[in-house]
């Protein structure tokens, strides 16, 4: 009888420990890595934000679209290749994300959006867009 109780208690403990382990387990995804050019960023902007992409917002929206994918994947590396990128609003960089600028990358801050919302004063925010207080897009 004592042996049977001991086996039952041990089984209950094993189940409890396994349950706690699964309860605190976080989803781990493969981190995303992207290499982008101005034209690739523009295409991503049109794909992700078709209705609000303008000639003024195409680069900021496209970069944010790539960074949103990286946030969902738990981070990664965004390599920005040579070219000029026009930025009207903030680019949000999520946790566990590295942004690499190759030689010849130029960011130009512009104050037009071509839409009914205003351009922001900042170019970079070190937090994910999903956690930003004031969310325009």
Report residues per predicted region.
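Extracellular/periplasmic carbohydrate-active domains that bind, remodel
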Residues: 3-10, 14, 18-137
């Amino acid at each position: 009888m004592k042996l049977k109780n001991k086996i039952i208690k041990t089984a209950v403990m094993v189940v409890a420990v396994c349950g706690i382990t699964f309860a605190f387990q976080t989803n781990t995804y493969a981190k995303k890595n992207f290499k982008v050019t101005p034209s690739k960023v523009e295409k991503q902007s049109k794909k992700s934000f078709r209705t609000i992409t303008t000639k003024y917002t195409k680069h900021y929206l496209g970069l944010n679209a790539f960074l949103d994918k990286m946030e969902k994947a738990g981070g990664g590396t965004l390599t920005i290749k040579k070219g000029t990128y026009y930025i009207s609003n903030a680019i949000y960089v999520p946790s566990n994300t590295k942004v690499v600028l190759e030689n010849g990358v130029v960011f130009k801050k512009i104050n037009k959006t071509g839409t009914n919302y205003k351009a922001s004063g900042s170019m970079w925010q070190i937090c994910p867009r999903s956690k930003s207080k004031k969310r325009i897009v």
